[in-house]
């Protein structure tokens, strides 16, 4: 009994969503396996499990990857039930992927995961200052997403945090999942304090 109290088993479920090719799977693989995949393979359905320690607590974090392509719009909701935190990802070098956070992803997440903490994640931060990326976007009348633009979207969708990362360089990767773990642990209490009129149940509900 004392051993159980000293090191309790805490399990949480994280679901990651966002446009296809925005960097979701690479982010998960680098965090869970420590290596960056060199070839892009569209995700159909993948799960990983990682141990995360935050604030002296060890958490077994189940990482649920999802496919962003429209072909999987009917399959993806199977990932949502019982989630404790959701990462909505976009790619910093693809402004349209941030626009889709507002136009597609937030409504889907709110529908299937009412009350679950959301973190907005800017992937591929290493490409923001890449000359080739900047030139390609300039030719389309666009530019890489700025931190201010992304933070504004994070505020609009009610995200508990906005974090940038680069799976390729490793920048911010651990910070993303530590923040997600904290959000999954504090979600119920934090949400209920902020909005006492909300229901206490904070897990996903498939309607």
UniProtKB/Swiss-Prot annotation:
Chain spans, region Disordered: 187-207
Domain of life: Eukaryota
Cellular-component GO terms for this entry: cytosol; plasma membrane
GO terms, biological process: actin filament organization; regulation of actin cytoskeleton organization; signal transduction; small GTPase-mediated signal transduction
Lipid positions (S-geranylgeranyl cysteine): 204
Keyword set, alphabetical order: Cell membrane, GTP-binding, Lipoprotein, Membrane, Methylation, Nucleotide-binding, Prenylation
Composition skew (Basic residues), residue ranges: 190-207
Pfam families named in the record: Ras
Cysteine methyl ester, modified sites: 204
Motif (Effector region): 40-48
GO molecular-function terms, A-Z: GTP binding; GTPase activity; protein kinase binding
InterPro entries (alphabetical): P-loop_NTPase, Small_GTP-bd, Small_GTPase, Small_GTPase_Rho
UniProt membrane topology term: Lipid-anchor
Annotated GTP binding sites: 18-25, 65-69, 123-126
Propeptide span(s): 205-207
Job description of the protein: Involved in the regulation of actin polarization. Rho proteins are required for distinct steps during polarized hyphal growth of A.gossypii.
Similarity-based family: Belongs to the small GTPase superfamily. Rho family.
Protein name as annotated: GTP-binding protein RHO1
Source organism per UniProt: Eremothecium gossypii (strain ATCC 10895 / CBS 109.51 / FGSC 9923 / NRRL Y-1056) (Yeast)
């Amino acid at each position: 009994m004392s051993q159980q109290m000293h090191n309790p088993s805490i399990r949480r479920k994280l679901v990651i969503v966002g446009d296809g090719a925005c960097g979701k799977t690479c982010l998960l693989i680098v965090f869970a396996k420590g290596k960056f995949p060199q070839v892009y393979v569209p995700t159909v359905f993948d799960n990983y499990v990682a141990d995360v320690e935050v604030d002296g607590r060890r958490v077994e974090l189940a990482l649920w990857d999802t496919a962003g392509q429209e072909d999987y719009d009917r399959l993806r909701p199977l990932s949502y039930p019982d989630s404790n935190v959701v990462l909505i990802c976009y790619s910093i070098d693809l402004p349209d992927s941030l626009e889709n956070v507002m136009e597609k992803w937030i409504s889907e997440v709110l529908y299937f995961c009412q009350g679950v903490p959301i973190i907005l994640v800017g992937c591929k931060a290493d490409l923001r200052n890449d000359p080739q990326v900047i030139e390609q976007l300039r030719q389309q009348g666009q530019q890489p997403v700025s931190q201010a633009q992304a933070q504004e979207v994070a505020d609009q969708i009610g995200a508990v945090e906005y974090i940038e990362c680069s799976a390729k360089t490793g920048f911010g990767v651990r910070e993303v999942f530590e923040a997600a773990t904290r959000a999954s642990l504090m979600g119920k209490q934090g949400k209920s304090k902020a909005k006492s009129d909300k229901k206490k149940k904070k897990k996903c509900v498939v309607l």
